[in-house]
């Protein structure tokens, strides 16, 4: 193509070219117009644009932009009024929400995504049961995600997980089911909710009361309901015990623990009866402490404390004698109800009282605990510095310490820090962590039978990187016998912030009195290395030695990046040795 020009209009053309050479600044446009334009960008591009300069950072961070994006993502959402940045928070919650799962059995080993309810305002927590999955959003709506038979793209009928949804109830605060890892025991779903109660005689208007509603997980039918006095407000519910003696533990807004006992085998009978709500012993023995969260399993319960509930001088003398000086925040207390679990967790039965299962036992830790994970006979704790401590049964290597020795006190896993989430299963553990480039990875240890540690069918005594693609905004996880679930959500107001370890603790060894995080015995480490060398020497060929070395690297307590380096280096050496000739298969002297 040839561009022609007229000599008579050469001056005009030159001036037009000069005008085109002057750039027009975007700052000359009204801010409202720029905000309206950038609001049509995808969220990922909008965030990238906001990182280019100070001007676009202010434009892309405006609440008006995020309000338009939020209404585009969730047209049915109401006006937001809570929090410092309500529209930005709501938009990011709905943009990042997702439930992903990977089945352990079958030929397809890929990550799948469940159906996304349009009515859901972000995902706060989830719970898989025997047949379905339940999800709670940030406005208290509980969704019932059903498994169903659907037609595939090839016209075949196949069974899909969490492919249809219905609203189970609204006004929910929390929910729980049987705490065992096997979902076959989760027959009922207990929902803690707020309901408007009609006015009684002599009063005007209705009152909001907390209640516990029990639903059948198979059909979503409500079979039982118990209502509490309007003066009591709860925020968390957990279950403990067997079906015939199911204990419901309820945490109040003030940090008190109440409990009641129901018989699940009689819940489906249409009758009315009264249950007794009593103050749990941990709140009676430690009345000045405020419990912030609970975790439970079949035969144990764990409490993490917050700030003091009442001034120390107002604590009764009897309570002061029972608890002379407990920690005000981040302390951990245990209830263990069976001798077998007690022995697995603490290595002894010395302090176990079979007549008093509710007596709280304090765990000694060097720092405040932020969150925890509780399995059947082992547990994991994460402190304010991002350190991971494991305790309990280690028969399958589920503590990640590099060996299979039980731990009767919290022991630090030195090569893992600052996790996003922690999960303790029946005989394996999972850690969700973030790499330096902000991508997520899933690490696991323990028993690998049944595919529960993807890529490691033989299991591992130390945390290894699992062969699974983790969503970018994954925040929590759950593992069952059949499936691995990961919840994707990002809340800009609830990001965990770890403290930097003081300089006095960085290079030095922990105090002898702490016990938790004490370094392993050097003699034991040397003995293990000698055993590894003897195993390598017993291999008949060089290729077998390479494979054995890869296996040993997986056993050793190394960081994930270090293990990846050694595995890649061994693969390179193995490929190079494979083409060197027939003499490479002869073992060296």
From Swiss-Prot:
Q: Which UniProt keywords apply?
A: Ubl conjugation pathway
Pfam families per record: F-box-like, RCC1
Q: Identify the stretches annotated as RCC repeats.
A: 386-435
Q: Which GO terms describe its biological process?
A: axoneme assembly; chromatin organization; cilium organization; mitochondrion organization; mRNA splicing, via spliceosome; piRNA processing; protein catabolic process; single fertilization
Q: What does this protein do?
A: Substrate-recognition component of the SCF (SKP1-CUL1-F-box protein)-type E3 ubiquitin ligase complex.
This protein's species is Mus musculus (Mouse)
All residue ranges annotated as the F-box domain in the record:
23-69
Q: Where in this protein does the record put region Disordered?
A: 506-526
Q: What protein name is recorded for this chain?
A: F-box only protein 24
Subunit: Directly interacts with SKP1 and CUL1.
Q: Which GO terms describe its cellular component?
A: SCF ubiquitin ligase complex
């Amino acid at each position: 193509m040839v561009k022609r020009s007229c000599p008579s209009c050469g001056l005009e053309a030159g001036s037009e070219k000069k005008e085109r050479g002057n750039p027009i600044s975007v700052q000359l446009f009204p801010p409202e117009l720029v905000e309206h334009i950038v609001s049509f960008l995808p969220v990922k591009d909008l965030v990238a644009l906001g990182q280019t300069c100070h001007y676009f950072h202010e434009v892309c961070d405006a609440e008006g932009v995020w309000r338009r994006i939020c209404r585009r993502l969730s047209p049915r959402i109401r006006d937001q009024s809570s929090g410092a940045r309500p529209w930005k928070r709501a938009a990011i919650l709905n943009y990042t929400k997702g439930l992903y799962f990977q089945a352990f059995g079958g030929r397809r080993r890929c990550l799948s995504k469940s159906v996304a309810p349009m009515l859901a305002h972000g995902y706060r927590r989830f719970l898989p049961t025997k047949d379905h999955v339940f999800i709670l959003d940030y406005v208290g709506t509980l969704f019932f995600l059903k498994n169903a038979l659907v037609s595939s793209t090839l016209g075949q009928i196949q069974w899909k997980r969490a492919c249809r949804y219905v609203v189970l109830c609204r006004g929910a605060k929390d929910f729980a089911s049987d705490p065992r890892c096997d979902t076959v025991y989760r027959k009922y779903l207990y929902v803690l909710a707020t309901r408007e109660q009609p006015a009684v005689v002599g009063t005007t208007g209705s009152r909001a009361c907390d209640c516990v509603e029990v639903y059948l997980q198979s059909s979503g039918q409500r079979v039982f309901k118990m209502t509490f006095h309007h003066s009591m407000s709860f925020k968390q519910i957990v279950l403990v015990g067997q079906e015939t003696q199911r204990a419901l533990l309820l945490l109040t807004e003030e940090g008190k623990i109440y409990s009641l006992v129901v018989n699940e085998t009689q819940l489906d009978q249409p009758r009315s009866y009264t249950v007794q709500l009593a103050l749990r012993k941990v709140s009676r023995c430690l009345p000045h402490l405020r419990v912030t969260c609970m975790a439970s399993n079949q035969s144990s319960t764990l409490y993490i404390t917050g700030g003091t509930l009442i001034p120390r001088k107002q604590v009764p003398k009897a309570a002061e004698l029972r608890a002379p000086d407990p920690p005000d925040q981040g302390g951990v207390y245990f209830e263990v109800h069976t001798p077998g679990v007690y022995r697995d967790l603490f290595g002894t039965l010395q302090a176990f009282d079979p007549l008093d299962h509710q007596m709280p036992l304090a765990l000694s830790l060097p720092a405040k605990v932020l969150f925890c994970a509780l399995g059947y006979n082992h547990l994991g704790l994460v402190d304010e510095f991002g350190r991971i401590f494991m305790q309990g049964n280690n028969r399958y290597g589920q503590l990640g310490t590099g060996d299979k020795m039980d731990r009767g006190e919290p022991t630090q896993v030195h090569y893992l820090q600052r996790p996003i989430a922690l999960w303790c299963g029946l005989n394996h553990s999972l850690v969700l962590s973030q790499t330096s480039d902000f991508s997520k990875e899933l690490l696991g240890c323990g028993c690998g039978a049944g595919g529960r540690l993807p890529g490691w069918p033989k299991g591992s005594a130390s945390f290894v990187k699992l062969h699974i693609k983790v969503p970018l905004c994954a925040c929590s996880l759950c593992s069952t016998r059949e499936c691995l679930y990961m919840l994707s959500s990002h809340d800009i107001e609830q990001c965990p912030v770890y403290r930097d370890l003081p300089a006095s603790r960085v290079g030095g060894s922990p105090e002898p009195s702490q016990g938790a995080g004490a370094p392993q015995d050097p003699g034991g480490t040397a003995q293990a290395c000698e055993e590894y060398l003897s195993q390598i020497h017993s291999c008949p060929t060089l290729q077998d030695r390479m494979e054995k070395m890869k296996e040993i690297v997986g056993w050793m307590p190394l960081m994930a990046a270090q293990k990846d380096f050694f595995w890649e280096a061994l693969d390179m050496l193995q490929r190079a040795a494979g083409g060197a000739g027939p003499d490479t298969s002869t073992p060296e002297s």
